[in-house]
Amino acid sequence: MLVISIDQIPRSPEELIQLSKYIPSFVLSVLPIGSVWIAHSSWSRIFGLQDRFSVFLSLLLVVLVLVFVYPMKLIAQITVEYFSVIFDWNFLSTGLFESESWSSELVWVIFLYVAIGLIFLSLILIAFYQNTLKFGQELSITEEETKHCITFSLIWGVVAGTAVLSMLIASIVSPENIQLAGYIYFSLFFTTVVVPIQYFKYRPLTPS
């Protein structure tokens, strides 16, 4: 609860219930950060490359994740609040849209922050895999491991591309349609699967 509330501990049942409304947005904000951590952990476990460039990328990744935490948490709160209004889920509403500090005119800035963060995080992860391919002979990388590197480079490339689209949408549409900049991310459930499949369909590692 301290992690969710950051600066306050619930001192009554009412405060505990109110604070619990932030749990869904906290979980939602952890998902992209968790995905980045899993990707880096998987890369490190499989390849374990420790050259200077990989160490630099690891440090840069840590810095970006720490910077990325607050925009991601805010966009997660907005997402949960949005769906609580759409579906009349009052038990999840935190009153964010009614607060004095809320400005619908500036929501696009939050989408911009999140998109830029995702783009840079994706580029760093792509750099990990592409740098690994450069050390293919030294690491005795197998064909399956080569495919692994290419696959995840494509996946994170799709994430970066989707973030660019979200940023463009957020910059163009009116505040009333700003949710479109968020809806575009749902396409990742489809594109991150289809793009690698199509890539290897037309560019197989072993020519038939």
Residues covered by each model-derived region:
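Multi-pass alpha-helical transmembrane bundle typical of ion/small-solute transporters
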Residues: L2-S208
